[in-house]
Swiss-Prot record:
Family the entry assigns: Belongs to the KdpA family.
Gene: kdpA
Segments crossing the lipid bilayer: 5-25, 65-85, 135-155, 179-199, 254-274, 286-306, 383-403, 422-442, 489-509, 528-548
Native source organism of the sequence: Caulobacter sp. (strain K31)
Domain of life: Bacteria
Role, per record: Part of the high-affinity ATP-driven potassium transport (or Kdp) system, which catalyzes the hydrolysis of ATP coupled with the electrogenic transport of potassium into the cytoplasm. This subunit binds the periplasmic potassium ions and delivers the ions to the membrane domain of KdpB through an intramembrane tunnel.
A Pfam entry, by short name: KdpA
One GO cellular component term noted in the UniProt record for this chain: plasma membrane
Protein name: Potassium-transporting ATPase potassium-binding subunit
HAMAP family tied to this protein: KdpA
Amino acid sequence: MNWQGWAEIALTLGLAVAIGWPLGVYMSRVWNGERTWLDPVLRPVEAVFYKAGGIDAQKSQSWWGYAGALLAFNFVGFLLVYAVLRLQGVLPMNPQGFSGLSGHLSFNTAISFVTNTNWQSYAGETTMSTLSQMLVLTVQNFLSAATGATVAAALARAFVANRGEGVGNFWADLVRTTLYVLLPLSFVVAIVLVALGLPQTLAAGVTAHTLEGADQKISLYAVASQEAIKMLGINGGGVFNANSAHPFENPTPLTNLITAVSINVLGWAAFFAFGRSVLAKKDIRALVIAASILLSAGAATVYWTETQVAPAQVAAQVDTSVNMEGKETRFGAPATAAWVAMTTGASNGSVNGMHSSLMPLGGGMAMFLMHLGEILPGGIGSGIAVMIVMAVLAVFVAGLMVGRTPEYLGKKIEAREVQLALLTVLAIPVATLGFSAIAAVLPEALKGLMHSGPHGMSEILYAYTSATANNGSAFAGLTANAPWWDTTMGVAMAMGRFMPIVAVLAMAGSLVGKPKLAPSAGTLPTHGGLFVGLLIGVILILGGLQFFPALALGPIVEHFQVLAAVAGH
């Protein structure tokens, strides 16, 4: 560890928040239908979509109408992705000559990209055709990100309304987020990445003549365009199996900084957009501070663990001052640590190093950040929505202490809101721990493990944590392309995505009809240090405590095993 490493981590985390603030102001204008500088160009395009779909963009939907449209849209997206992947072998733009995917892999991949998880049970360069990468996977990177943003927009309207009825129009929110936010930003970032050396071609690849005299086929794709939305949309699915550790996806420290910042920038922007939309910037600033504290602590922990000399290297008398296993030398430990925290604190899941090669406590921290609910800052819209749920639970706990009906952002928090909040936060532990418990004893599931003992348990726990939290990163020792893993992880991804979405929209439906209350003497201030501390406590208890027994069986036991093995060497 040195000051340069800490400065690199601070710069990466800080840039994302700093850039996210002005983008949040712009995003709130998009959500609220206000005029933007892109209106002269995009308003006519927007109108074409509404006319083609028969959409009345001014018609506000009830929460269940909004949720129904969202679920129907995503189900159709799932069917289209599944069909293209199954029929890949007979479809055009397949210069690689790849055959169609199996039923279970198509099922898993379709759910993965529709839910913004981007878990990949395959290697992209040996499995996916150019058409599959561009037509369905990249398109879903846009649409799944926009879907998450619509949830936050609907929830914001519920807090603003005074005895209102509707929470907005799903189709209008989806179109506007895609056209005005995701497409322009992705275009700019893609151009920058092309200039910095990322491939952007429809060619299948090139043949290289190696020094040994053999020929090697090097795969090429339209990498830059997919990389841009992969990061900005907080998706994470890589064109290549090595993801952002691959030199075609992330060749230099500069591209690493740009793409790392891109992981979190729109997540933070959604926080600021929510604050501007509900006219409560100070209250949302408290949420940003709480999330930043937890994310910074996570990054610091990973950096500390990875800059300790690995005990096995000490025992073998290997001269090294840092654990470089699984890391790219062009990035080093600080950039890897920052990426680990940012990709698991958000629902991104891309990697610039191998998480399975992290020290046990470093890998455990990656899991722990996902266990907190993907709210640091989480996905576009989905992160702030779940953070608002945590804030609702925090004011509920505070209300119990003083014997008053809690209020948050001018709305009374009553039994229905608390029930829906609990349903939201229970989705991750129920699916993660339930499936992990079954997989730990089922022979069919255990066939996919490369390791036994606590690291094998960590592989299982990490996989289902990543799936349910819609993250998508993995411990690479798990062979997941098998019927059991593809099917159960697909179900876990759907549970982790749509249970919280429906619960949050139901909460929005409950809040929208309530009167907007002015703060009174008995209202708990939700913008000061006391509330930040209370919120962090609620997040740690609801997120961390539920998973501690499982973590104790995996990374914590492995940590002490490593120490014991070295002590007995």
